Structures are given as C-alpha cells and as structure tokens.
C-alpha cells in the first residue's frame, strides 16, 4: 500500500512538472506572437510637380527576414514598400524602403501603409501594423493691414501649390474657401477673429480695436488636401 501511494505521488508530481513545462513554452510562443512587425511613414508636403520619394521605416523588426506593405489611397494601390534581409539574418529596426508619389496623376489626402506579408526565419507569417499618413499640397499665407485711429484692419492672402497648373509643371494658385484665423500679440498671441478667402485668395479686412501699436499674424487652417501655414508677423 505504501509503495502504491509513493508511485501515485510520483506520477502526480511528474504530471505537474510536465504541465509546468508546457505552460512556459506557451508563454514564450505567446510573447513572440505578440510582437508586430511595424513600419512608420512621414507625412508628405507637396510643393513641386516632381516625383516624391515616400520612405517607409521599420520601427519593430520582430525577427522578420522580409516584410512588405502596400501604399493605398482608399482601395487604390499607389506604390509599395518591400524590406528584405537577404534571407539569412533578420531585418534591423531603422531599415527603410522607398515608395513613390506622382503629384500630377495621383490623389491627395489620407494614405495607408497596409500590411502585405512578413515572414520570420522559418518562413512563418508574422503580424504587421497598418500606418496612416497624409499627402497634401503646401499652403502659403501673407498678412497685410493698416491703422485708422484706434482701429487696425488686417487681411490675408492664401495660395496653394497646384501640381496640375501651368501645363502640368505646377504653380502657386489662389486658394479659395480657406478659413483664416487672425492673432494679435499682447502678452502672447491671442486670436482676434477669422475670415474666409474668396476666389482671389484674399480675405475681407478684419477690424480690430487696438489703441496701441501691436503685432499681428494669420494662420490658414488645414483641409483634407491642404496643409496649414502661419504668416510672418506685421506691426500696426
């Protein structure tokens, strides 16, 4: 009877040891699986009609030997990134590849780096991230104004780069319907009002009560296809 109990106890302890070993291995596999091969892409500011290089930089390698992402605008495939180590060693964080954007033929707006494939040294698939970025045209803004007694009148002009203007060579054109905020510097920049640009790119004048001479500047708000911009300051 005593020997039977000892055998049963040994079997029970052995069973626990086996279960414990499996649990540890599962945790390690889970840790590896939780790593996501990741890319980052900087926003693109379009100010010419030339082809733009859009670098995609690896931020988490996770032991991958290859990884690729599609550059999508909505469902439309524009370009892609492909990173490969050569097959013998894993990729390193900081490695990058180039995608391309053609301003005169491709849409502006929100873009996505969409996962395509990533493999480890055993050629098993690894999870990947998606990354959102924007490609928009640059804006320019200038401010002008004058003083009349205790009032200052300021207005702004906004232009934007149009890659399709000038027979596809691109040029700066008036930017209509843009919201512009005006600021006065009195112990820091304080917003004093807003106007919207017309067809000629100009806003109407904004009247500001200001007995003392102060500095003014203007900021044009971003749109889905235009970047924001702030003017230099003027004193009136």
Positions of predicted regions on the chain:
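Bacterial N-terminal signal peptides that target proteins for export
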Residues: 1-11
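Low-complexity, Ser/Thr/Pro-rich intrinsically disordered linker/stalk segments at domain junctions
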Residues: 2-4, 19-80, 85-236
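Bacterial N-terminal signal peptides
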Residues: 10-20
């Amino acid at each position: 009877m005593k020997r039977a109990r000892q055998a049963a106890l040994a079997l029970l302890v052995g069973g626990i040891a086996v279960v414990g070993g499996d649990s540890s291995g599962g945790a390690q596999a889970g840790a590896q699986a939780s790593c996501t091969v990741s890319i980052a892409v900087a926003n693109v500011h379009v100010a010419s009609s030339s082809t733009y290089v859009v670098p995609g930089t690896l931020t988490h390698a996770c032991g991958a030997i290859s990884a690729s992402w599609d550059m999508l605008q909505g469902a439309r495939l524009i370009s892609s990134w492909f990173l490969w180590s050569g097959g013998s060693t894993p990729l390193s964080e900081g490695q990058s590849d180039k995608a391309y954007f053609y301003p005169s033929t491709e849409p502006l707006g929100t873009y996505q780096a969409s996962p395509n494939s990533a493999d480890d040294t055993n050629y098993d698939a690894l999870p990947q991230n998606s990354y959102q970025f924007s490609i928009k045209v640059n804006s320019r803004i200038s401010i002008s104004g004058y003083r009349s007694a205790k009032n200052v009148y300021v207005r702004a002009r906004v232009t934007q780069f149009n890659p399709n203007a000038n027979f596809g060579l691109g040029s700066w054109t008036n930017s209509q319907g843009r919201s512009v905020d005006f600021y006065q510097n009195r112990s820091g920049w304080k917003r004093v009002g807003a106007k919207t640009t017309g067809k000629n790119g100009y806003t109407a004048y904004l009247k500001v009560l200001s007995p003392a001479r102060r500095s003014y500047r203007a900021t044009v708000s971003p749109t889905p296809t235009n970047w924001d911009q702030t003017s230099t300051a003027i004193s009136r």
